[in-house]
Amino acid sequence: MFNANVNDYMNNFFLYDSATGQLELNTPEILLVKEFEALLDAERNKCKQDPKGIYKLRAFREFRYIYLAIHWNSPYADYFAKDRHEEALKDAEMTEEEFEDPLFRAACRKFKEL
């Protein structure tokens, strides 16, 4: 029974706001999982557009990739793994270097486990 609840919980992990084009975390409690919380670290989110890392732009792109490439309800769910990865990278505006980041890969593995 617990597994069913976890699956229901994870199925509702993301919300897509079609008006803004933003992917949002529907269940912020998921950030209690260290692999997901690590993605939001301000230091790793610093970029040209967000020098202080407060807007978590990198984490947003990473969560977008996780949804598009791994989530069972992704629009790319029926694609072959390689094609799904390429489309998710493109749509998430991520580089291969960002994809290979150990913290991000750990979050992907954790999402698959859940």
Where are these regions (language model features)?
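N-terminal, charge-rich alpha-helical recognition modules
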Residues: 1-113
